[in-house]
């Protein structure tokens, strides 16, 4: 397995973010490599300080990791408000608009962010881009009418492929849907417009753009952490 050149940066970000965790909090746990480090850091703090916290996870992988490390988890159908949601991102532009969902959990990730009083995105410096799109844009689509949905997307100029799993079959999300990865267009200077256009298509469950009020912490190889806020409501 290829070594992650930003692993130490992600660990530092995770430790810094874990300092925000206070007794009595309900945490939203994101998905991906940076969120994995945050879960580990929170578990260590929970164990060392006997911290009274609970959490809800955006993916089966994050849920399993948190459970294995002793973080108490709540029923993912019963939470209403989350105190702090921490997640990563695949790309972030200068306006702090981002693409998420590379791990296939965008629908649940967005619900956790929407439900949280404080939303924190952790990202290493490689995730900062001038224009969104090079990573690709994942969207979650319904199995029902799959071919029709994809045909509609292609007619609008959104070309891509259904994501495959490691066994060669179609990748299935935790919600039993498909992921369609758009590779053309590969630049989104006005993601708000594309987001609205895509969400008007029946059968699209969620789109990988995140345009919301969030804090973003960028971690750099020199050990510095840059903290920014969108200022959006």
From Swiss-Prot:
Pfam families: Rib_5-P_isom_A
Keyword Phosphoprotein: no
Active site: 109
The entry's keywords: Isomerase
Reactions catalysed according to its record: aldehydo-D-ribose 5-phosphate = D-ribulose 5-phosphate
A GO molecular-function annotation: ribose-5-phosphate isomerase activity
BP terms from Gene Ontology: D-ribose metabolic process; pentose-phosphate shunt, non-oxidative branch
Sequence positions that bind substrate: 31-34, 87-90, 100-103, 127
EC number, as in UniProt: 5.3.1.6
One GO CC annotation: cytosol
SUPFAM superfamilies reported in the protein's UniProt record: D-ribose-5-phosphate isomerase (RpiA), lid domain (SSF75445), NagB/RpiA/CoA transferase-like (SSF100950)
Pathway in which the depicted protein is active: Carbohydrate degradation; pentose phosphate pathway; D-ribose 5-phosphate from D-ribulose 5-phosphate (non-oxidative stage): step 1/1
Cited PANTHER family: RIBOSE-5-PHOSPHATE ISOMERASE
Similarity field: Belongs to the ribose 5-phosphate isomerase family.
Complex and partners: Homodimer.
Function: Catalyzes the reversible conversion of ribose-5-phosphate to ribulose 5-phosphate.
Protein name per the record: Ribose-5-phosphate isomerase A
Species annotation: Chlamydia abortus (strain DSM 27085 / S26/3) (Chlamydophila abortus)
Gene of this entry: rpiA
């Amino acid at each position: 397995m290829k070594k992650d050149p930003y692993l130490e940066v992600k660990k530092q970000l995770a430790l810094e973010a874990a300092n925000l965790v206070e007794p009595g909090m309900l945490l939203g746990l994101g998905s991906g490599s940076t969120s994995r480090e945050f879960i580990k850091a929170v578990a260590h703090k929970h164990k060392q300080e006997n911290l009274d916290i609970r959490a809800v996870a955006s993916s089966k992988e994050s849920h399993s990791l948190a459970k294995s490390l002793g973080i108490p988890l709540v029923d993912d159908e019963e939470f209403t408000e989350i105190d702090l949601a921490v997640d990563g991102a695949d790309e972030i532009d200068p306006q702090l608009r981002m693409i998420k969902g590379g791990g296939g959990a965008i629908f649940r990730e967005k619900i956790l962010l929407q439900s949280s009083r404080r939303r924190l995105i952790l990202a290493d410096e490689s995730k900062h881009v001038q224009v969104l799109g090079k990573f690709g844009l994942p969207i979650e689509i319904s199995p029902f009418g799959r071919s029709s949905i994809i045909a509609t997307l292609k007619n609008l100029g959104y070309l891509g492929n259904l994501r495959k799993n490691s066994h060669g079959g179609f990748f299935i999300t935790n919600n039993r849907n498909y992921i369609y990865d758009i590779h053309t267009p590969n630049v989104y200077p006005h993601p708000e417009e594309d987001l609205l256009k895509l969400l008007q298509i029946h059968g699209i469950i969620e789109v990988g753009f995140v345009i919301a009020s969030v804090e973003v912490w960028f971690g750099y190889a020199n050990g510095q952490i840059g903290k920014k806020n969108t200022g959006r409501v």
